């Protein structure tokens, strides 16, 4: 089968250190953390009191008040990012082409905020007082459906839920659908709004969150000897993918090209990654083969700041690239914004596209005392200008759901 080329023509992002692509990108290049004491609710009863919480985000800048009230916060991020990406792409819709435009998103948790509110309300007020829009508001597919309804997109519409790999998975599947000719355009990415009391209690019980409450901006420290867990974040990353000739014909801005995608399962444990990194290595090898490459110029790592993940990913990178691994810059976006679960891989895809555009690698911050077992070039502390043609982005979700994406300079 003839595989069509797929390019990125629009971006949108909301993250703890910036809403809007240029604001977010500037913060990343400056190594600016968005992690702070949580105030979405009172965290005093929890051992963890910090998060990558987005502040100053106004949903009414992107949707009507009626819509904003009817949807959960994770959908707010999706609608906002969709508007940003579509504005940048200058996509013109007609009744003839809407059936060739898809919406494929990722979310690991869906409408958790509204779900928690309604569970509490139901037990307080009784089961006959349940909000009538509870089901569509909580459902993970609400984000894709709300975007399709708003813009009239009538192609494939779905949400993929593979925990921390959800956003990357969605981008990969959107890439495939365009590549194989099922659609011409797809709005894709990942969104998450996990900052709820239940989620905090659950993740605290798992003992995977950093307890560095006294120094929030230093809490997320991938590959550092003193890392003690990840910091939960929220947000969304959105990309408009388009078949290359379709984009060229309408004079769209071509920001990068998606050239490789692979996914697999580690079949090892619901939370712990395969410690030798074999399955993470296997998915990277498959993505490289899909792109027809043997190496890349930069790796945006999954790099959650947990002992197990950072070590396994380092081993996997070395297994794939051998001695060359020590010459490939690797950095962690999560060091600045925390781990936004299903949105993480999509936000990092935005970072990869911006890195290719500006030929610069954002840093890993808080890498003060490198772990001897994590001995690659993690671009510590300061952004680094670099010649970038191909970049790799890794996303590894709970349940050993592994995804690798490759983005290349637009040609």
Role assignments for model-derived ranges:
Residues 8, 23-25, 29-162, 191-200, ...:
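Conserved beta-ketoacyl condensing-enzyme motif
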Residues 22-29, 113-127, 177-180, 200-213, ...:
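A glycine- and small-aliphatic-rich helix-loop capping segment at beta-alpha/alpha-beta transitions
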